[in-house]
C-alpha cells in the first residue's frame, strides 16, 4: 500500500536563480522551504523551451506548464512538433507530404510551396519551408516554386527582404526551388471575408496577374521604395519574357506551410471549395493535390492535412478516475483554470471523483497591494483536505510568486514568497500527521528575477530558469534524478502510489534508488 494522500504542490512562478540581485526567492525569509530542500531529495527541473514543447529558449508559462504536468508527457505545440519532426527525420516520411510529391512525379507537374515567409513562429516558420525544399530535393523534383507571403506583423516591417535573401541562399545551397510570387499577408491572409483582397492574391497565384518583377528580391526592394512594407506588398508575380514563371495549374501540388488556421482558411477555401462564392475564379476549381500543415477547417473539402491535431488522452485526472481514485484540485481564482482545465488536457468537465475547491482571489487593483493574496485560505482548504483522508490525490497551486512577480515590485514579491513559505509549513505538518507523501514543484520561473540584468529595469516576465522538485516523506531509500522536466512529475507520482504508468504518458519517473 502507498501512503495517502499524495499531494502535488505547485508553487506558481517559483524559479531558481543563482544571482541574488532582484531575486525575491533568495531574498525572502523562507525557513520551511529551505529546510525541506536540505532534508529531503531536491533537484532542479526544466520548465522552459523544448522540455515543455515550446521553441528552444522560450520561457515557460502557466498554461503550458500545467498541460505538460497533467498529461505526463511533453505536449508539443504545432511549431515545435513540426520542427522536432524535421530534426528527427519523421517529417520526410509524412504520408500527406509524400502524396503531394508523388502527384508531381506521376503527372510531371509542379510543386508549389506557399506560406508566411517569417521566423515569427506565430503562423509559420521559415525553417519548415527549408524542410519542404529538402523533401523536394530528396525526391528529385525539378519544378518547385515558392510563393512567399510577407509578414511585417510578427516580424519587423521590412524584414521580408532579408528572409527572401536567406531563402534564395538556401535554394542555391540545395539546388532546388525558385520564388514565383510575392504577396503581403494583408491580401492573402485575411480572416474577415474581405474577398476583394484575397482575389488579388489568388489572381497572382493562379492567373499570373499582378505587379510584375524580374525577381523576388527586386520586387520587395521596389515596394519598399514606394513606402509599402512587407504586410502590404501588392501581389507580385515573377516574370520572364513577359510571362509569369509559374502560375498554379491543374494537377499541380500545393503545400501550405502555415500551421495556424485562422488566416489560412480563406485562400484555402478559394482553392478547394467547389461552390466557392467569394469571387469569380476564371478556371473554376482547379484539380489539385492540396496539403495543409494543420487542420484549418474541417468543412473545407478537397484537401488533406499533414499534421493532424494530437488529442491528449489518459491525463492524470482521467487515469485516477479510471482506477477509482479520489482527487481534489485546490487553487485561488487566478490559477483555478490551471489546476482544472489545463491540468486535464484542455477538458472543462471534472473527472469522476474529482472535487474542485475554489478560493476567491482578493479584489485589489494589483497584487503588490496584497502580496499574500488568498494563500492562507488556500492552505486552510489544503490542510482540511489532507487531514480528512478523503482523497487519494490532492493537487494545489499557490499563485503568489507568479502573480506578485508580474508586478516587478521586489518588496511585495518577497512578502509573497514568505506568505507561501508559511503555508507550505502548515501543509507539511498536516501531511506528516497523517503520514502522507508530497511532491513540490513549480510550473515556471518568475519571482526569482525581477530586474533586467542588461539594463537594470524592472523585469516582469516569466524566465527560463529551472524550478525546484522536492520529494517529501516518500521512502528514505529513494532520491530524485537530475535532468527531469514537468512531464516527468506525474509518472513520479504514479510510482509513489505504487501504480502502473499508462502507455500514453511518455514522461519518466524521477525516482531512483540511493
Swiss-Prot record:
Its EC number is 5.4.2.12. Substrate binds at residues 123, 153-154, 185, 191, 260-263, 335. The active site is at 62 (phosphoserine intermediate). The keyword Repeat does not apply. Binds 2 manganese ions per subunit. It catalyses: (2R)-2-phosphoglycerate = (2R)-3-phosphoglycerate. Mn(2+) 1 binds at residues 402, 406, 462. It comes from the Bacteria. One of its GO terms (molecular function) is manganese ion binding. Pathway: Carbohydrate degradation; glycolysis; pyruvate from D-glyceraldehyde 3-phosphate: step 3/5. Its cofactor is Mn(2+). One of its GO terms (cellular component) is cytosol. GO terms for biological process: glucose catabolic process; glycolytic process. Keywords: Glycolysis, Isomerase, Manganese, Metal-binding. Mn(2+) 2 binds at residues 12, 62, 443-444. Belongs to the BPG-independent phosphoglycerate mutase family. Monomer. PANTHER family: 2,3-BISPHOSPHOGLYCERATE-INDEPENDENT PHOSPHOGLYCERATE MUTASE. NCBIfam families: pgm_bpd_ind. HAMAP family: GpmI. Catalyzes the interconversion of 2-phosphoglycerate and 3-phosphoglycerate. This is 2,3-bisphosphoglycerate-independent phosphoglycerate mutase. The gene is gpmI.
